[in-house]
Amino acid sequence: MAYRKIFNWSRTKSCYAKILYPKTYLEISNILKQNKEEKSFSFKASGGSYGDCFLNDKGTIVDLNNFNQILNLNKKNKTIVVQCGVKIQSLLNYLMPKGFYLNSIPGFNEATVGGCINSNVHGKDAHLEGVFGNNVLSLKVMNSLGEIFNIQKGNKNFSSAIGFYGLSFIILEAKLKIIKTNSTLLKVDTLKFSNYQRLFDLFKKYEKTKFPMMGAWINHFDNDGSGIFKAAKWHIKSKTKKIRF
């Protein structure tokens, strides 16, 4: 198989690699078993994770975009099972019309569940809800020998599957904890600040007023640290049935 040029998400970096497109878990397993001589494999879906870690020059990249199915929603237990290639955008479009939401999601809606787990990303609610890995209840994974098994939260291997960029396991499926929401809209406050102290004061103020989502964009060319602060909370009175992200 010839090497192909592949770019990172921002198209600022690239590499030449063999790219494979498996359609089943068995095909992924066979790729690993039949290419034991291969020095390095990397796995990608949307390719939007920080660090561009999937770039594998003169190696093999296994594309997991085919694994993009939502497998099960349990409204009673507030859980959902998805494949690794499901994008955050697709997940929210599925959940929110049903009155559910997911904590600790990144601002990049093209990110996939597998990438969010491997990078252990956080959202604008990180000060309250922590990281994306806190949503994960169990995983279906594959090891470097092509063997598939399930690991539950609390298992000794569980923590090594989250935030390790695929060095421990290939994530195939994830069972996630979801939360109820009564709205599909947010009330957003946007404020300018002229220095870092004012920014810190805004964070403290909005934390006390129970805005669960906060963030700031800072002008680093200004030594005083000016920028834009945003805080958001659910707009409970919304009657909107569906919103697309």
Positions of PLM-derived features:
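Glycine-rich N-terminal segment of FAD-binding domains in flavoprotein oxidoreductases
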Residues: 10-104, 120-125
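Structural signature of FAD isoalloxazine-binding scaffolds in flavoprotein oxidoreductases
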Residues: 51-71, 125-146, 170-177
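C-terminal substrate-binding/cap subdomain adjacent to the FAD-binding core in PCMH-type
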Residues: 118-119, 137-245
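N-terminal regions that are enriched for targeting/export leaders
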Residues: 2-10
